[in-house]
């Protein structure tokens, strides 16, 4: 359906295994979203993980050292855990990935280059989508809606994020028929200049 370059500009799609998104900023990013804290294999933690590094890696201080069955291990405070997945790379026995603990999220409008406008971070447009491999029909449907709207309304050489900035986020959600929820509100204190306020 979108095999020929008939779009206003090239669309860069990225995927990432977590919301940390080391894949970078893409026009459309499909990221795994974890919904449950990691399950810890206490038998392997002492031999595989550098525990102080794992504790330091957690952005919300939800991981602490512990002794389990007489072996050094780790424990997770499930009330603090934000399920970001930052603990898994330095400690594979802290398995966070699984069919019952992952969903998908779609972010749009990211850009690394400074051509025509400054580099931008992408923004969340759909969250908690079911992880239904191998075709991911719910994700494919939303990506197609975004691409159709962009193809119809985008100007020549205008990147996806530039198109959204031109038409505005409310119009983008109307054109793509996506639900705007509280998760899309940019309420970070340092982002006051980007808030949609009068």
Predicted feature residues:
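Peripheral terminal and linker regions in Fe-S/redox and tRNA-modifying enzymes
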Residues: 1-198
